[in-house]
Amino acid sequence: MATKLARLATWLVLVGCLLWRAGAVQLSPPNSRTNDLASGTPHVARGDTEAQSGTGDDSDFPQAVVEEVADMSGGRVPRVPASSTTTSASEGIFRRLVRRLRRGRGTADGAGVADETHQGPRPPLRKRLAQHFRRLRGFFGRLTPRWLSGLGRRAQRWWRGRQRPLLDPSFHGLEAGDSFMRDLLKREEELIGYCREEALKEPAAMVEAVTATVWPQNAETTVDSLLSQGERKLKLVEPLRVGDRSVVFLVRDVERLEDFALKVFTMGAENSRSELERLHEATFAAARLLGESPEEARDRRRLLLPSDAVAVQSQPPFAQLSPGQDDYAVANYLLLMPAASVDLELLFSTLDFVYVFRGDEGILALHILTAQLIRLAANLQSKGLVHGHFTPDNLFIMPDGRLMLGDVSALWKVGTRGPASSVPVTYAPREFLNASTATFTHALNAWQLGLSIYRVWCLFLPFGLVTPGIKGSWKRPSLRVPGTDSLAFGSCTPLPDFVKTLIGRFLNFDRRRRLLPLEAMETPEFLQLQNEISSSLSTGQPTAAPSVA
């Protein structure tokens, strides 16, 4: 504690000395005897002094009268008047030291006295303070902690944010781009269904075990709401996809005649009862963080919040369902949410199988996906939230064409520290690979946004990172492993320059210089992207693909 107080006192003394030095001025009135002595001509008025010195300016530095003595060669050599000695003697030691320091800053090789006679008007106090502050910052720059060195930049960014009008990245109902995506994907519904079936072949044993546990003899299952919404009778329609710890099914509420996606969790070391209870709290805490209902969050923020959490009737919630199988134990905790048509990961796998986004319509679809991804991330930033899984397998295109972000349990309040392992390793920037914990900032979502947009145009990840499910992807497991850091677009669908610029700024390895989603919406590149989409949709003529040089 004493050390900290001593450091604080030292800083205060240094700053006080600099401020006193910068503000040191003559306190006597202009026509006083003190000024007469300073000019070297006692009892002479200011005007007479100017006449003798040959100057007529109103400088705050009175010009000294210089005597001349004969040189051996016949010339004249200027000499400082004798009265200056008297003046120096009459001043205090510290005052003379300050004056000499002030004179010596702009001189070199002993030219201080000669240069002072030619000084112009004294700079204003504000400029002198700024100059001294720059000197102080340069002197103590290496001793300043990193968090303090960036304080000015953060304050400047905060002030700019207060000065400019706040952007509203929220969505307003169904937009023209959504209808275009709906019609485009509807034409490829059969192909997407085929690719979904292929993706479910490998985990078929897990899907069958979970299905038999939740729907014995393929009968309807009665579930009770954990949110006081009553009971439901759910009938299985088909499996949709498999995650690391869950299986998602398409089900029908036989009484309300509504279709939902039902997320069923498997139990294990990572899905213990306490972990599922924490997951339940985190999932429905997202609505409280947003201050919006699940319906409003889906409509305005495009966040896919669950409609309900349910448990199989007559069995304890969060416990293991019985009868079940030891290899694939199922938790009695199920999430109901609106069903999506396709997630971006499955869409990329489909495009890798048969690239259907060809021609002008395909290019327009890529433009729309790019703009919607940026707005999705900007919505999170506007609410002060960070999503740890802003990844293609967690981004869904709904039946009406809207792009939504799922798994709201991965939402963090900005500035919160959490486990770095909660971020998928191939989508983690370097600041999340150097320690066991990391601070969740908007820079994380900016990085993941850049990777997702890159995959929209290129299907695979950049920097040689491995991309499961994509033919010909690279093998680098993460940025922790040495490899290329250059951003290449040679194997991608031809990109417009403004999209390349946005991707490059999102994928800046320096997180302090990384372009954030809200800032991206103010860039000329994003405005050009929006204009391309609007003009193509309004005229009915899709935007042309960029030419390849």
Swiss-Prot record:
Glycans are attached at residue 434. Disulfide bonds join 458-492. Its main location: secreted. One of its GO terms (molecular function) is ATP binding. ADP binds at residues 244, 246, 263, 337-338, 340, 393. Disruption phenotype: Gene knockout results in reduced virulence in mice. Recruitment of host monocytes to the site of infection in mice. Faster clearance of parasites from mouse monocytes. Reduced levels of mouse IRGA6/IIGP1 phosphorylation following Toxoplasma gondii infection. Increased recruitment of immunity-related GTPases (IRGs) to parasitophorous vacuole membrane. No significant effects on host gene expression. No significant effects on parasite growth in vitro. It holds the Pfam family Kinase-like. It is found in: Secreted; Parasitophorous vacuole; Cytoplasmic vesicle, Secretory vesicle, Rhoptry. The keyword Signal applies. Mg(2+) 2 binds at residue 407. Residues 1-24 form the signal peptide. ATP binds at residues 241, 244-246, 263, 337-338, 340, 343, 393. Residues 234-527 form the Protein kinase domain. Keywords: ATP-binding, Cytoplasmic vesicle, Disulfide bond, Glycoprotein, Metal-binding, Nucleotide-binding, Secreted, Signal, Virulence. Mg(2+) 1 binds at residue 393. Transmembrane segments: none annotated. Pseudokinase. Essential for virulence in the type I lineage. Mediates parasite survival in mouse monocytes. Required for the parasite ability to resist mouse innate immune effectors triggered by the IFN-gamma (IFNG). Reduces the accumulation of mouse IRGA6 (IIGP1) and IRGB6 (TGTP1/TGTP2), immunity-related GTPases (IRGs) that protect mice from infection by certain intracellular pathogens, on the parasitophorous vacuole and IRG-mediated killing of parasites by mouse cells. Component of a complex at least composed of ROP18 and ROP5. Interacts with GRA7. Interacts with ROP17. Interacts with mouse IRGA6/IIGP1; the interaction results in inhibition of IRGA6/IIGP1 GTPase activity and/or oligomerization. The protein kinase domain is predicted to be catalytically inactive. However, ATP-binding properties are preserved. Belongs to the protein kinase superfamily. Ser/Thr protein kinase family. This is Polymorphic pseudokinase ROP5. The gene is ROP5.
